[in-house]
Amino acid sequence: METPSQRRATRSGAQASSTPLSPTRITRLQEKEDLQELNDRLAVYIDRVRSLETENAGLRLRITESEEVVSREVSGIKAAYEAELGDARKTLDSVAKERARLQLELSKVREEFKELKARNTKKEGDLIAAQARLKDLEALLNSKEAALSTALSEKRTLEGELHDLRGQVAKLEAALGEAKKQLQDEMLRRVDAENRLQTMKEELDFQKNIYSEELRETKRRHETRLVEIDNGKQREFESRLADALQELRAQHEDQVEQYKKELEKTYSAKLDNARQSAERNSNLVGAAHEELQQSRIRIDSLSAQLSQLQKQLAAKEAKLRDLEDSLARERDTSRRLLAEKEREMAEMRARMQQQLDEYQELLDIKLALDMEIHAYRKLLEGEEERLRLSPSPTSQRSRGRASSHSSQTQGGGSVTKKRKLESTESRSSFSQHARTSGRVAVEEVDEEGKFVRLRNKSNEDQSMGNWQIKRQNGDDPLLTYRFPPKFTLKAGQVVTIWAAGAGATHSPPTDLVWKAQNTWGCGNSLRTALINSTGEEVAMRKLVRSVTVVEDDEDEDGDDLLHHHHGSHCSSSGDPAEYNLRSRTVLCGTCGQPADKASASGSGAQVGGPISSGSSASSVTVTRSYRSVGGSGGGSFGDNLVTRSYLLGNSSPRTQSPQNCSIM
């Protein structure tokens, strides 16, 4: 389409080509064309000015209305969030106070634990000394028992010898009695022989008297007869009679002397024999008495030693019983104190874990509030930048705390680059945490809820009758599977408990089917615990799913944002004494956009700096970590905690706020 100046130039060119013009005419025509062109430009400018004024009036009206709406919304939101921030600050103050109190209690409990440990060490030292003393006493007792057994064996030997000696003494006493009896018989025979000798002497005297009487009578008769005989033969008869008498007397005297000698010889021989037998018996009896006396002396000494050893043994046994009783009392006291302290430590750990969970929930709430406040701040800053309004003091302070990367992309009246969203990709990853305190461990948990696999890691069979598997998915109802009463898991064997919906075959003892449940359940936080028959948790495995939302853009600023995200994420893990919490993704439930990242402050959390509005990538990870207060021993804060990350979305300002957004 030709303009008026072009049409005029065409006409003038045609006229000039038809008729030649003078220079003055040409000059005037050019001036006329210039004036017409200026008039056309002025008319166009006036029309443009009028349209711009009309548009400006409409825009001013819209700005006024928008300012009124924004002022009303900002005032309401400011009041609401100031109240919420006040409550959050109070909650954080109370949590900080509670944490300080718990730290003081923890330090106190640790001091008590150290004291109890020192006392326990001392008691163990005393116990070791008592055990050493007990061993010495047992060795002494064994030596005394050996000496006692030796003394008893000697006593038995001496008793045997005493019994033999008593038998010999009895025999000797019997022989002595026999010898005494023989001596008495010999004495009786001697007396009898003496009596007989006396009788024979008396008889001999009597016979002598009789013979003398007879001799006198014979003499008298012979004398009488000799009177009658003649005197010649009287001498002959007298001599014959004297010879006969002398011969008879000599014979009688020889017989008596011979009988006396024989009797004396027999008596002296028997008396010598009896005396020798008595001497031998007296010697044997003396020796037996001496041996018996020595045996009695030895028996008395051994009995005294035995009684002394028995007294020492009784004293040692009494002392040993006292030591065992005191040792048992000390063990019971130590065991009771240790049980009480362990129970107190378990209660303290449970309270600490409960306080830590509450503190974690409060920090989650705080981080969500910080993200919402940051999102509102981004919206307000975007509107202020679009409308070229003066920033509020809060925005200035917020920009003053921003990182250098955000300052470079937002400062100096730079123009925000337009971005075009091409595609959105979500990635899910699982993190696992397992704990085992017995022989059986939870080896594998299916992400889709098809099965749970257990393994016996020991070298012994494990009876699992009436054991339970408890499955918890977030706030969903608890699922409980109970093993058969006679089920036993062999050493090194694996058992898989299938859900009914998995289509597996029931094949004990390696494959069990839970017919009452179609699935074990699936979700973002799956906790599987193995409970024994006494109700104690012996194994646990927790499966946490993290969803990462990644948006691909046309702009080349995505690499810068990813680089910034990587640097901030890596810098947060430099301290080896930090414990990271488990990963989460915060997404808007209505608009589908990830929540913006907040610059969380405080003693408990560490997050990355703010992201510039000109960045194109919307996948941002905010990692919160806790610094360990105590040592690395059991019962510290970081034992049962895992990483927690917040995956945030696009931080660029929106041109229009979404309606009914749960985050906004």
Curated annotation (Swiss-Prot):
A cellular component annotation (GO) from this entry: perinuclear region of cytoplasm
Region annotated Necessary and sufficient for the interaction with IFFO1, chain positions: 259-331
Outcome when changing residue 145 to K: In HGPS; atypical
Chain intervals for the UniProt region annotation (Disordered): 1-25, 384-442, 552-576, 598-619
Effect of residue 541 to C: In CMD1A; grossly abnormal nuclear shape with the nuclear envelope producing prominent lobules in about 10% of cultured skin fibroblasts from heterozygous patients
Biological process annotations from GO: cellular response to hypoxia; cellular senescence; DNA double-strand break attachment to nuclear envelope; establishment or maintenance of microtubule cytoskeleton polarity; heterochromatin formation; muscle organ development; negative regulation of cardiac muscle hypertrophy in response to stress; negative regulation of cell population proliferation
Name listed for the protein in its UniProt record: Prelamin-A/C
Domain IF rod: 31-387
Coil 1B, as annotated region: 81-218
Residue ranges of the region described as Linker 1: 71-80
The keyword Phosphoprotein is annotated on this UniProt entry: yes
LTD domain ranges (all copies): 428-545
Effect on the protein of changing residue 215 to P: In CMD1A; aberrant localization with decreased nuclear rim staining and formation of intranuclear foci
Effect after changing residue 377 to H: In EDMD2; no obvious effect on nuclear morphology in cultured skin fibroblasts from heterozygous patients; no effect on protein level
Post-translational modification: Proteolytic cleavage of the C-terminal of 18 residues of prelamin-A/C results in the production of lamin-A/C. The prelamin-A/C maturation pathway includes farnesylation of CAAX motif by protein farnesyltransferase (FNTA and FNTB), removal of the last three amino acids (-AAX) by RCE1/FACE2 and/or ZMPSTE24, methylation of the C-terminal cysteine by ICMT and endoproteolytic removal of the last 15 C-terminal amino acids by ZMPSTE24. Proteolytic cleavage requires prior farnesylation and methylation, and absence of these blocks cleavage.
Annotated site residue numbers, Stutter: 325
Region of interest (Interaction with MLIP), residue spans: 1-130
